[in-house]
Amino acid sequence: MSISCETPLGDVSHSSEILLVATGRTPTADELDLDSTDVITDCGYIVTDETMRTSVDDVFALGDVTNPHQLKHSANAEARVVSHNLINPDNLISVDLDPMPYAIFSNPQIASVGATEEDLLESQTEYVKGVAEFSEVAYGWAMENTDGFCKVLACPHTGRILGSHIMGPQASTLIHQLIQGMKFGQGVKELSRGMLYVHPALNEVVEVALLKAKDALH
């Protein structure tokens, strides 16, 4: 098997005798004999409400079997909710997985949260963007990184962050500031100029992307 792709440095080809596909897991609720119970499933996933309770009052479910995210951090959040609700049946709490971030620990790392440009175009949502390359900041320049970037997508009127996508070293760490901004309503203005960024930390690439998005606001 071979694959070819075009890059700024020219065409690149790779050949291999084996292709490893690791693209997620399939729920196996059908192996739990749930048909003999009142627990409802949908496309193999166990259906739960916001408290992680199934269609049977005293039965809770969490993790990969309940949602397609199949991410450890979402399962951790669900586990905290289920643990509380099992111990406190008269004081149930709800799980909140929004916004759902993810990271790919490849080389380079990739991290993402919220909408992509394709999502926003498809939904006809107005947006502005700020894109900063790692090479624009001191740490990235010192690393001689030429392909890493941080992209911030924001509402053109309010500056609310709609999504962010990072590729490069420490992307899985850098994305957290933008997750926090989305979660707590901190827009590009507040995050870019409402705090100081340590120099020459790699976080400056996030600052530059936020500044570019801020400057593009209407």
Explain the meaning of each model-derived region.
Residues 1-13, 19:
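Conserved beta-strand-loop-beta-strand element in the redox core of flavoprotein oxidoreductases
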Residues 8, 49-50, 155-156:
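Short, acidic, Ser/Thr-enriched surface-loop or helix-capping motifs
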Residues 106-116, 121-218:
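Flexible, glycine-rich terminal cap/loop adjacent to redox cofactors
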Residues 85-114:
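Active-site-proximal substrate-binding core of FAD-dependent oxidoreductases
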Residues 6-9, 54, 115-118:
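Flavin (primarily FAD) cofactor-binding/catalytic cores of flavoenzymes
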Residues 1, 56-57, 143-148:
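A short, glycine/Asx- and small/polar-enriched loop/turn
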Residues 14-89, 192:
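FAD-site-proximal beta/loop scaffold in flavoenzymes
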